[in-house]
Amino acid sequence: MGRPVNKRVGRHLRLAACLSSGLMDVGLLASGTATTLGFGVSAIAPVSAQAQSLNLPTAQPTAQPATSPTAQPAARNPEIKVGIVQRFGDQKDDKLTLGSLAGDQLTVSFETSGQAQTVTTDRLQIDITMQPLPTPVLEEWVVLSTHRSFESAEDSAIRWQAAGINAEIAQPDAWQVWAKREDYNSPLVRRLLLENLHAEGYTRAFLDSRAVKEVPKVAFTANGFKYVRDAFTITSANRRIQLAEGNRQTFRDLYAGDMKIQPNAYGTYTLVNQVPVELYLRGVVPHEIGPGAPRSAIEAQAILARTYVLRNLRRFAIDSYEICADTQCQVYYGLADADPGSNAAIAATAGQVLTYNNELVDALYSSTTGGVTARFTDVWNGADRPYLTPVVDSLSPKWDLAARPLSDEANFRAFIALQNGFNEEEWPAFRWNRTASLKEMDEILKLYLKNRQHPLANYNQLLDISVVERAASGRVQKVTIETDQGSFDLVKDEAVKALVPPRSLLFYVEPVMEMPPATKPADNDSTGTSLGEPTITLADLAEGSNEEAGVSETPVEDSTSEASETEAEQTPDPILTGFRFIGGGFGHGVGMSQTGAYNLGEKGYSHQQILEFYYPGTVLQPISKAVTFWDGD
């Protein structure tokens, strides 16, 4: 959001306590306010002054933050809940096969008519059956904001909460902040909320509605019998479970701990792995930094991965698990590809976490910084972290950020032109140059806008992309997109989500111009430029020779001069065909650079020195009662 949420909106709209109980059914809505969606489903039409005139009591805002703090003391090796298959049931043919190791068996625990029941087997198949509904059901929620990252979504949720609108963080695809469904649980209340938000200027909020005619139901088959249950737990005596996805009959993955199939907030199911954190790290560390890294770099990665997961256990509260298994959290592949060197690094640092003022740090890291790390607020909304400040990723004094901040465009382009003297210089992602055609850019941008129900989602022509603001670390803070229907801004990490060609926020952009095909090519002309030949930029045109501009300094006869003038008049203007993005780095660039840590490790840096380099002022200590996992911002 661009401005603080108006508290008057929250006071006026927290209506659930007095309305929800009587308006749960669409059919119970007041006469004259319902419309039909098309398959027999009724929904409330947008609420007008009639609804606003209702004398509705207000509920007081709660002081509780949008996400619950995890400030309790922790065990040395706590168990965590990881969503390893997050959207099981998205496809009708989704399948999972679970198996025990030789000599062991799986125990499946579930309920039948309220009674606990168990089944023992060595192999379990889980699949989906689509269940038609007798009548379509209206499924909807109010989306208050949409984000690329959890970090910005959490900041938005906290702001809405402070304004008196209970909010929850969801991830149906992109991260979103929803008006809390149990509070805004009737069509009338949701539409009243949305109308008032729009009236107050929060026009990016929208109602995500759909009529559901069938729902996925999960079932498992064991010992020749099929059981349809919404939730069940899978355990084994040695706490090792094999997994195969799809139609594979052979097991590729092995997980420690227990498994559970459970419903999520999106009408599908999640396979959750409950696992001790030290065993979890064996499935993270070798995939995050690679087994070929120097030992000290792997140890630093192990400490960061441990710190990161324990601080972020609140991410999926809406779905009743804690962390995911992909790059939105940390990649996690279980034990199948565990590496002896990584296991040794994990064991050597067991229980150690990185802290600041006895609280776990926000242990962010990325592949490659591009030569300079970013401040937290250079990438996301929220409060700055004192230990996440711009650091030039070099062991030599390559650049003085205080004297030459990269917020200045000339300074930034000079910095990006540097190729040598950095910790990451030998890695391909350190510097890059990527071009996308107008067609490719249109597809990317229109999908981004459509998913956010943006009014410009159906623009006809993309005219320009320009960086209008940078941070001192060089990260793009605002990009303006100009179309034939109007312009809009992309702020911070939304630029990477919407544009795609940039691999980080450390970039500048140039239009790609091409000469159109000649309408009447000369018989002997073999040097004309066509759409299939090399492109030129506006900078190329500006720096071109006088001859390229159609002006000759050599005296010529009148007839030739007249011909030249005629040719110049007929020369078409170059046309925009795409955009070129020039930059450096891969990922958000906050905290440790994994490729930079490689170099530091090779130079003899210990894991303590690597962590101090990227997180100045932090303290390494064991998990204890004195350490707070997360106490909110």
Question: Where do the protein language model's features map onto the residues?
Answer:
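Conserved, single-site charged/polar hotspot
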Residues: 2-633
